[in-house]
Design a protein with these regions (language model features):
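Phosphate/NTP-binding elements of NTP-utilizing enzymes
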Residues: 2-344
């Protein structure tokens, strides 16, 4: 599948042509993810929702100076403005410019901006004509504050827009999720149980995966010509060899690079406890521990609710000490990410 244009930038058309309802695209900085998606909806007159994580982000992009449509409008030689529709969202419109330079909206609404953190306030609105939801920067940067039950908020947002169109014989809403490779343990990957799949794709150098049974497509924008060219620019010369460079140019998730991910011969270990989705084992002789998604034997059992996690951690907090001392190993990145989620 061709996912780059002749200039080396990401091209969204073939991704959307898969017709899969959920399309997750992770790639380096500045390879054209957002530009390609927004240009496509304008070129093809597709009604869309442009989703960001927080209301502050939506408020910012609603200003003309920070609009993601400004570079597209400049490229196409048109004007696109944002018009407030409610306290929480705006509509994007084509616009005419007066002799005084004032922009006036004309024609129908092209699409809407919405925030994941406040979309529940808009559940009554009709989105019958929306066929594409673009969730930009769906993986938060590490310094960003998490949204409580973030994945559930996204699923509810999808349901709010999709409604019962499939029961009426219509195609489901397509959700195009775009981001940099900031965090493999992000809420969407975790709740959709995609971490192991993404980890395997990275190990194999696999650019895309299409799962028609689940309706999910995953695209890793590795080996972009744009990323290679950016390596010679000032910022990336200064940050050569850093985690930032690996994320921004090489599309690397740091969670997949730990030395603690090391499949072990399970027969050498004894199960001691199982919590949520993971089991912990103690080596029979060398004092190390192992964490896996496998469950066998008769370990202490704990759920993943708040009270069970507290009870588990109170008894087994020494597992964190072992982790800090590099004596706790993991079957895969999923196991380590879940452990960090439960222990923190």
């Amino acid at each position: 599948m061709q996912i780059y244009n002749k200039d080396g930038y990401f091209e969204v058309e073939n991704v959307l042509a898969t017709k899969l309802p959920f399309l997750l695209v992770c790639g380096g900085r500045g390879v054209g993810k957002t530009f390609s998606a927004l240009k496509y909806v304008i070129d093809h007159d597709i009604k869309f929702v442009f989703l960001r994580r927080t209301q502050a982000q939506v408020d910012l992009i609603s200003k003309q100076e920070f609009s993601p449509f400004t570079p597209i409008a400049n490229y196409l030689g048109i004007n696109i403005v944002s018009v407030p529709l409610s306290k929480y969202n705006t509509g994007f419109y084509k616009a005419e410019e007066s002799e005084e330079g004032k922009l006036t909206p004309v024609g129908p609404c092209l699409g809407y901006s919405m925030a994941l953190s406040t979309i529940s306030n808009l559940r009554g609105f009709s989105a019958e004509d929306v066929t594409l939801m673009i969730f930009d920067e769906f993986i938060p940067e590490r310094h960003e504050r998490p949204i409580k039950a973030e994945a559930a908020a996204f699923f509810n947002a999808y349901e709010t827009i999709n409604r019962n169109r499939e029961l009426q014989g219509r195609s489901p809403l397509q959700a195009l999720l775009l981001s940099n490779s900031n965090d493999a343990g992000n809420p969407i990957f975790t709740e959709m149980k995609l971490i192991s799949k993404v980890e395997m794709m990275k190990k194999k150098g696999q650019i895309y995966s299409l799962d028609y049974d689940r309706g999910i497509g995953i695209f890793m924008l590795d080996n972009s010509r744009i990323s290679k060219a950016k390596a010679e620019t000032a910022l990336y010369k200064a940050t050569a060899g850093s985690e930032f460079e690996e994320m921004a140019l090489m599309n690397e998730f740091q969670e997949f690079k730990t030395d603690l991910i090391k499949p072990m011969p399970i027969k050498e270990y004894i199960p001691i406890c199982h919590v949520g989705e993971i089991t912990f084992f103690k080596h029979k002789s060398n004092g190390t521990y192992y964490c896996s998604t496998m469950l066998f034997g008769d370990p202490d059992m704990y759920g993943a609710d708040e009270n069970d996690l507290k009870r588990w951690y109170r008894k087994y907090n020494y597992l964190w000490t072992a982790y800090m001392r590099n004596k706790l190993f993991f079957e895969d990145a999923t196991s380590e990410i879940i452990f960090n989620k439960y222990a923190n």
